[in-house]
Amino acid sequence: MAIQTSNLGYPRIGLQREWKKTLEAFWSNKIDEEQFLTTMKEIRLQHVKVQQEKGIELIPIGDFTYYDHVLDTAYMLGFIPSRFSEFTSYLDVYFAMARGSKDHVASEMTKWFNTNYHYIVPEYEEGLQISLKDNRPLRLYEEAKQELGVDGKPVILGPYTFLKLAKGYTQEQFPTILKQLVAPYVQLLSELHTAGAPAIQVDEPIFASLTKKEVQQAKEIYEAIRKEVPNATLLLQTYFDSVEENYEEIITFPVSGIGLDFIHGKEGNLNAISKYGFPADKTLAVGCIDGRNIWRADLDEVLELFTTLQKQVQTKDIIVQPSCSLLHTPIDKTEETHLSTELFDALAFANQKLEELVLIHSALTQGTESISNELETYRNVHHTIRSSAARNREDVKAARTALKEEDFSRPLPFEKRYELQQVALELPLLPTTTIGSFPQTTEVRQTRKEWRNGVISNEQYEQFIEKETEKWIRYQEEIGLDVLVHGEFERTDMVEYFGERLAGFSFTKNGWVQSYGSRCVKPPVIYGDVAFINGMTIKETVYAQSLTEKVVKGMLTGPVTILNWSFVRNDIPRKEVSYQIALALRHEIELLESSGIRVIQVDEPALREGMPLKEKDWDAYITWAVQSFLLATSSVANETQIHTHMCYSNFEDIVDAIRALDADVISIETSRSHGEFIDTLKHTTYEKGIGLGVYDIHSPRVPSKDEMYTIVEQSLEVCDPKYFWINPDCGLKTRRTEEVIPALEHMVQAAKDARSLLKTNA
């Protein structure tokens, strides 16, 4: 039996975020297309070279992208919306789809399964001619072969997952469009096989959550493809969960090998193998290293997994690989020497995970004695972090034990609270507000950098933050917004900011991962018990409120979002970590309220993305996620208005959960998803305060008043005007001042027009 190492995908952004910087330089016309393509090629080949040097045998090719791999697939197959037909060059079309243009909105963006990565949603239009417009995987395969001598493994998004992620068709049209994908996929795979690709990885993550009927549909497509490409080595790759429910059928697919996730789907996949075995004529690709977290593997546990598999599986070949693409992890931990030894030793970023794969390969091919020293080191590291004081705080344990049922609910029901809040806040019909952040200009970022580097004093930095806050309070007053925000100029990131001020968190210097496009985030590391230390937002919020007679919102990030946007310790359940964060935020909210802040927003944009892929597992997650929010927010007075915010989610799955949060007002991304949530509300009622975002903040274009008014009009068909708010989709941190001010002016004017119409109709 042959055993090989493989990787499913490598982080794109570069060790020093060279990828991000190159993209943004190109977008701002600081480099031309030739320089852009040259630099991107250098980065792409460097990533292949690193994996080669680490000893990976099946190196992924084609996982690299200029923006998003789903967008790459859409372009490759001709899924190009007609509104972009005026563009002729590849890059102009590609980036217009991703980012929009002066005259046209971008394609929708949403979360990649239950991760914090965002993909561009493919759009199907009537009359679309589906064909292989560009065999990009072939070009990149040949490039790696010619430039580096690497006979790589092309990676493509599978036809079933691709079409399931697309929009614009009816369910009745789905089977027909799916069949139309056969020809371009046959051409793609045939050309790769002819070029000599030793194996082709076909990603089908959606297989973890298909119905029996859908699996049969998918099988028919693979049979049609295999009939035309009989000799290509196709590796069907699943990840993010088990395929237990459909395993018996999936192992009969006409493919050469099947990749299973034994981290996030370990129990289900092992159960399925135990029950149905594994085909002797197929390769089993074992996802045994966590591709979504940053902790060293438990090598003993991984080797035990292989012992179990080898007793049950008589396959011809085994592949040792991560559970999913390493896109979701930072690149290398070697620069994180500022961390404590116990934490640094416990980490494994992408490059360290590749080394772990090679260690496991050595143990499997040469015996565990060949890595005996490494095994001993790993055992010591795990023991040290498990027994650390940071993970065993008695005060945190006591606070958790003391929780009572009444800690999870507000004293009065929403309707009665809202009446009291209307009296206390004196807001107009259809109040306007923003989501929280204002532009982080070059000056803001530079001043923060100077402060962090000791170039300016704490006092100078605080004066600068106050100056920016006052400037934007005045802007908001002039624009005519009803509920103001302080602008969050002191915050780099909505999760990092709180993590820096809570016990149990640590921070990397270079632990960046891609969120969407060129936007990278540096998730905090929750390594210990989380606890409140001191006030985190009081000073800035109270200062902003002192500048105006209007209401200023306090702005916090919610417990579930902090959890889902962090790298989380894996020694206790996520629910327990979430409750720890909620208790710390509860303390902060009480301080804001006692300081005179009457509206407090607790953002939960990541609530939906944390949901398990399988519907049977949703209830358990939603229960503790909602309870975490309630634990954080339920101790305030009835007159204090609790807001929350969500974005980029499939909200129809969680309308009941949104209702259960019992927030007085929720603001939701609407315009980027082209009104999808408005459609959801046509089939259900939402009887609490709600603001449906009226413009997409991720595009540089300034929408007209009429565009926003149209969304308000559509929203009021499904929402009670008494409870309706008007706001942008998300925070405005990444936009420029000259984009934000006219957009908000248009938004306020749209609100005034809507109020006038309501009064006239009344």
Curated annotation (Swiss-Prot):
Binds 1 zinc ion per subunit. Its cofactor is Zn(2+). L-homocysteine binds at I435, G436, S437, E488, D603. Zn(2+) binds at H645, C647, E669, C730. The active site is at H698. Its EC number is 2.1.1.14. L-methionine binds at I435, G436, S437, E488, D603. It catalyses: 5-methyltetrahydropteroyltri-L-glutamate + L-homocysteine = tetrahydropteroyltri-L-glutamate + L-methionine. Pathway: Amino-acid biosynthesis; L-methionine biosynthesis via de novo pathway; L-methionine from L-homocysteine (MetE route): step 1/1. HAMAP family: Meth_synth. Belongs to the vitamin-B12 independent methionine synthase family. Catalyzes the transfer of a methyl group from 5-methyltetrahydrofolate to homocysteine resulting in methionine formation. This is 5-methyltetrahydropteroyltriglutamate--homocysteine methyltransferase.
